[in-house]
């Protein structure tokens, strides 16, 4: 039987390899099991196609042959058993009457049950029936005597037949009831012996019963052991969760501490506030007094000098009296000069375009000294630096002289100003004006020095009333009271995020619980909370607060709480019913982030058993029908669009280089268009930095030919102080350009934006579950996203949107909506998070857009291989620890394994550097050779992970110096980001009870620890010079930026696969093949990683160089 099963497995394995191109033992067993359950060939073929088998003749023939083999095997088994039973029946009786009698007798024997406790009753009842009918018993005894001889002769045959059978329990116990009856006929024929024999029968059957009970007890003990182990594991997971929760409460940074619990704290707080206020008032009063006192003292000094001069002008004074008089006079002159300089405006060189006339250009603003009676030039006598003043005046005279070819009349008129013209200007086609919102707004031209809106001069309440959502306040509140779930649709900037929570708070919804509002990004949550706190008139953290990871700016007074969607998801771990909230607003729902889609499913269940909870889904797009259908036909509340019209301009032909086209368009707008800030959408940090460098290079040599252009940037990893620069008001006679990723598409609102440049691309994360390849791919945006970008221009004035693609491409090549993130990303983190929340049936979880089943299965398989899930699909203690780290499951497994290999310090450094990505080194074009040489100094012969560790350790030894980064061509901003990530991971390491240990010299332990998390991502070098992955059997190559590119090792593990021109492994480290079996014996067998074959020397390098 075993040899037959083995041959079938080998045959199925060969066929699968011929059809699919790879083989796997678990797959073979699975296909064989499917064949046994299949009803016919067609159903079996359809099942195979669901497992990604191609529909062709090979698959159909394979299915037919496998079904034939399975059915033939079953028929052989049944035929063997039936033949043995027929042989025993034919030999046991020669007549049909005897056969019928035996069948009846066997049926009677089967009524004796060996396991049940009431067997004694059955035997006794049978004995009593015999005593009631003597004749019947005697007749049966005579019949049994006749069968006595035949049964003795056939006794051996029956026993041999029973040995050949398939260990059927009925076959083993069939002859036992006959033996005591035979003994009864030979020894005794009276009734008493019948009862005794019945008792003997029970005594002889008792061993079978005890054996069964013993086996059942053993099974129960084994089951109880498994249950105990499972319960123990679940108890450990729960205890770990409780400990983590307690540590969270202690370690979470509380920016606002609520001291209102005791009277003493209230009194102390009031005293401190009174003291601070008193000190502030004292300072103001002192300053005001000093200003007035200064004037009085100066007047008194002047009078004193005049009086002394009148009294002593005709008298001869001593030398000391003359010195005192000169000292007072000098003191008065200095004090007067300082006051005059503080009151006058600085005299500085102005651009010719701003000069009104020649007289104003040459006009001096210096104040003459009244004490100077000698008729000297005022500017020369009162100037603090007369040489600089003279030089500036000479320069201004030469700038307007007629010898330079400019007349003073032209300068003052401003009608004939010259424009700087670029050679590579882009021609745009203007689309029809799309009027959305208010009509009749005339075209507004921004004047020099205007900030783009009148909101700067308006009070906060006036600004609130000017927003589009304000006229619909009462209708919105009535709709929230009437419906439990409400879909709100309004364009970005209409006031949904800042005003709706305040309206609900003012209407009394916060009396029964907090009003929560989620944001997809932490930057948005912090900035919006600060704005709302300013509008409410409270300190941030009191009535209005925010909550992001590692930072909690809330208190017990907080009634309006802004948070990231990930924080609300994590609140389900501790409070599944969200009892502290009365209203929840899911903002920017149209972005369909990973956590937003999870919240949809969780909140949909909560609203069904919490009728008091109000749920508002806020979206900036018109795709509200899908949200309404998902939430059981929830009504939709529409808010009108933007206040000003936006014109759209398309290019006449497609642009080959959209980044260069965006830079040219910025300069073109800056030269030819009226004042107003520019917003440029780019795909990522690299493009933002590159565009900023290109703009600085092209404007550096223009000088006064163009007006001032302020270049700012915004992306998620940018430091907070640099992010805040985009919100600073633009100085007069200048223009600000904001280079942004899609973070500025909906999450941030920047005032003063008049022009939007949309290249039509964005960077999306894509995941292929078949190859396990996840990469960021630059893809065209959707039409909904393009309209979102366009809407950023119509907030404060009529705007323009310049799209760097054709109108035909917008209508025919762009998708209608963006693919949800949950359908194009690795679900390892999602599955781990849902499992930690106790949601086990992931296949039937109510997603709005369910992820591909193959992606979900791949995530479950990966988590099981990593040890995060047990064989029941439940979360293990290791998995509960892994869920605490905001990184990929493979990285979190590597961090937890560092406790075993005693290298947690080094692993934290490596994880932090890997999280930064590929922005560590930079390579200027003019210093490429020096940059490459500096980078090679950090190379480690065993892999890129250790190279990154060297970079961080040397930077730390230099005292985190900026100059060290500059000298080694390393981006200091990326290193600071890695340092922040490492600090966060170190705090989490303490939460999951893992000590911090350093072992920098033991590189084998570090590489083993890396392999313990990334054993799935292993690859072996082949004779062709290419690598082949062991899991997916895919040909890949080492990325040219790797330190092992020139001398590839035989076995490596890689951090990620990147699909560019080829499939590249990025961030690799050398391992030994035996480690794979040692770390993951459930995945790699010893024969799979047996490495006896030797490769020719440098074969990999030769093939790669080809």
UniProtKB/Swiss-Prot annotation:
GO biological process: mRNA processing; RNA splicing
InterPro entries reported for this sequence: DEAD-box_helicase_OB_fold, DEAD/DEAH_box_helicase_dom, DNA/RNA_helicase_DEAH_CS, HA2_WH, Helicase-assoc_dom, Helicase_ATP-bd, Helicase_C-like, P-loop_NTPase
Motif (DEAH box): 587-590
PROSITE patterns reported in the protein's UniProt record: DEAH_ATP_HELICASE, HELICASE_ATP_BIND_1, HELICASE_CTER
Basic and acidic residues compositional bias, start-end: 156-167, 232-283
Subcellular location: Nucleus; Nucleus, Nucleoplasm
Pfam families according to UniProt: DEAD, HA2_C, HA2_N, Helicase_C, OB_NTP_bind
Main enzyme class: hydrolase
Binding site for ATP: 490-497
Assembly description: Component of pre-catalytic spliceosome complexes.
Name listed for the protein in its UniProt record: Putative pre-mRNA-splicing factor ATP-dependent RNA helicase DHX16
């Amino acid at each position: 039987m075993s040899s037959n099963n083995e041959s079938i497995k080998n045959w199925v394995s060969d066929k699968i390899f011929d059809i699919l191109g790879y083989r796997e033992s678990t797959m073979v067993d699975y296909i064989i099991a499917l064949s046994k359950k299949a009803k016919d060939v067609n159903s079996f073929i359809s099942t195979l196609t669901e497992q990604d088998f191609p529909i062709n003749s090979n698959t159909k023939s394979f299915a037919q042959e496998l079904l034939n083999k399975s059915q033939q095997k079953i028929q052989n088994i049944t035929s063997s058993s039936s033949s043995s039973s027929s042989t025993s029946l034919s030999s046991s009786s020669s007549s049909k009457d005897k056969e019928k009698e035996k069948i009846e007798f066997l049926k009677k024997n089967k009524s004796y049950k060996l396991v049940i406790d009431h067997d004694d009753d059955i035997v006794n009842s049978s004995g009593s029936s015999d005593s009631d009918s003597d004749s019947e018993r005697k007749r049966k005894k005579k019949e049994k005597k006749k069968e006595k001889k035949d049964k003795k002769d056939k006794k051996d045959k029956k026993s041999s037949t029973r040995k050949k059978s398939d260990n059927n329990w009925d076959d083993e116990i069939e002859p036992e009831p006959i033996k005591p009856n035979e003994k009864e006929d030979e020894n005794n024929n009276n009734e008493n012996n019948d009862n005794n024999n019945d008792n003997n029968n029970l005594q002889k059957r008792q061993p079978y019963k005890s054996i069964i009970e013993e086996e059942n007890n053993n099974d129960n003990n084994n089951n109880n052991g498994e249950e105990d182990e499972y319960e123990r594991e679940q108890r450990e997971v729960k205890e770990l969760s409780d400990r983590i929760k307690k540590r969270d409460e202690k370690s979470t940074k509380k920016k606002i501490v609520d001291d209102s619990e005791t009277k003493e704290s209230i009194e102390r707080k009031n005293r401190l506030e009174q003291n601070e206020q008193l000190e502030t008032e004292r300072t103001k009063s002192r300053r005001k007094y000093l200003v007035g006192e200064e004037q009085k003292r100066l007047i008194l000094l002047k009078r004193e000098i005049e009086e002394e001069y009148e009294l002593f002008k005709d008298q001869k004074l001593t030398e000391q009296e003359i010195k005192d008089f000169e000292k007072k006079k000098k003191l008065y002159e200095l004090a007067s000069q300082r006051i005059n300089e503080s009151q006058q405006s600085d005299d500085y060189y102005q651009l010719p375009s701003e000069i009104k006339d020649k007289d104003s250009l040459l006009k001096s603003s210096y104040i003459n000294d009244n004490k100077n009676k000698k008729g000297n030039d005022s500017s020369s006598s009162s100037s603090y630096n007369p040489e600089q003043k003279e030089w500036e005046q000479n320069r201004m005279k030469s700038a307007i002289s007629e010898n330079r070819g400019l007349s003073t009349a032209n300068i003052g008129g401003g009608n004939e100003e010259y424009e700087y013209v670029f050679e590579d200007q882009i021609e745009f086609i203007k689309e029809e004006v799309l009027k959305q919102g208010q009509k009749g707004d005339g075209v507004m031209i921004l004047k020099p020095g205007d900030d783009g809106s009148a909101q700067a001069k308006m009070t906060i309440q006036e600004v609130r009333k000017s927003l589009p959502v304000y006229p619909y306040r009462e209708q919105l509140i009535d709709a929230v009271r009437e419906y439990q779930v409400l879909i709100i649709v309004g364009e970005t900037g209409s006031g949904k995020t800042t005003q709706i929570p305040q309206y609900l708070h003012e209407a009394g919804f916060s009396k029964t619980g907090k009003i929560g509002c989620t944001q997809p990004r932490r930057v948005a949550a912090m900035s919006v909370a600060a704005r709302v706190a300013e509008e409410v008139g409270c300190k941030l953290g009191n009535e209005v607060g925010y909550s992001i990871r590692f930072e909690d700016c809330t208190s017990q007074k907080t009634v309006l709480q802004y948070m990231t969607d990930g924080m609300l998801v994590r609140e389900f771990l501790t409070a599944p019913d969200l009892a502290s909230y009365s209203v929840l607003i899911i903002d920017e729902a149209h972005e369909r982030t990973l956590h937003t889609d999870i919240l949809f499913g969780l909140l949909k269940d909560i609203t069904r058993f919490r009728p008091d909870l109000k749920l508002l889904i806020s979206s900036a797009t018109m795709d509200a029908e899908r949200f309404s259908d998902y939430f059981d036909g929830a009504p939709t509340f529409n808010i009108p669009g933007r206040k000003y019209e936006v014109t759209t301009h398309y290019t006449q032909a497609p642009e080959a280089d959209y980044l260069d086209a965006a830079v040219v368009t910025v300069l073109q707008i800056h030269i030819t268009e009226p004042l107003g800030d520019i917003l440029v959408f780019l795909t990522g940090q690299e493009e933002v930095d590159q565009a900023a460098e290109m703009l600085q290079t092209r404007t550096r040599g223009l000088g006064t030919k163009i007006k001032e252009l302020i270049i700012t940037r915004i992306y998620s990893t940018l430091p907070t102080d640099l992010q805040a620069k985009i919100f600073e008001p633009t100085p007069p006679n200048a223009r600000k350009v904001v280079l942004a990723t899609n973070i500025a598409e909906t999450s941030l609102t920047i005032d003063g934006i008049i022009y939007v440049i949309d290249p039509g691309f964005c960077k999306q994360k894509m995941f292929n579950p078949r190859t396990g390849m996840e990469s960021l791919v630059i893809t065209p945006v959707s039409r909904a996203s393009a309209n979102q970008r366009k809407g950023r221009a119509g907030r404060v004035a009529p705007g323009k949107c310049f799209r760097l693609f054709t109108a035909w491409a917008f209508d025919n090549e762009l998708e209608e909506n963006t693919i949800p993130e949950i359908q194009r990303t690795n679900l390892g983190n999602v599955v781990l998070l849902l499992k930690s929340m106790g949601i086990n049936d992931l296949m039937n979880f109510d997603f709005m857009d369910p992820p591909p089943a193959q992606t979900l299965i791949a995530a479950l398989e990966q988590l099981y291989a990593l040890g995060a899930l047990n064989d029941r699909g439940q979360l293990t203690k290791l998995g509960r620890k892994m869920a605490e780290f905001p990184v990929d499951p493979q990285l979190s497994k590597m961090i937890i394994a560092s406790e075993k290999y005693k290298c947690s310090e080094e692993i934290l450094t490596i994880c932090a550097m890997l999280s930064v990505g590929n922005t560590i080194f930079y390579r200027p074009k003019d210093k490429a050779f020096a940059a490459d040489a500096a980078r090679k100094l950090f190379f480690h012969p065993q892999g890129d992970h250790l190279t990154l560790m060297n970079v961080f350790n040397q930077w730390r030894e230099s005292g985190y110096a900026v100059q060290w980064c500059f000298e080694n061509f390393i981006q200091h901003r990326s290193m600071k980001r890695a340092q922040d990530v490492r600090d966060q991971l170190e705090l989490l390491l303490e939460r999951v009870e893992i000590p911090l240990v350093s072992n920098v010299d033991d590189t084998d332990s570090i590489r083993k620890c890396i392999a313990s998390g990334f054993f799935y991502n292993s690859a072996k070098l082949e004779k062709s010079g290419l690598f082949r992955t062991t899991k997916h059997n895919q040909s890949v190559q080492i990325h040219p930026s790797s330190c092992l590119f020139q001398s590839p090792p035989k076995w490596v593990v890689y951090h990620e696969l990147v699909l560019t021109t080829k499939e590249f492994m990025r961030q690799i480290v050398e391992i030994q093949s035996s480690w794979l079996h040692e770390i993951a014996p459930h995945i790699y067998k010893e024969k799979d990683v047996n490495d006896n074959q030797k490769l020719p020397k440098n074969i990999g390098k030769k093939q790669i160089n080809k």
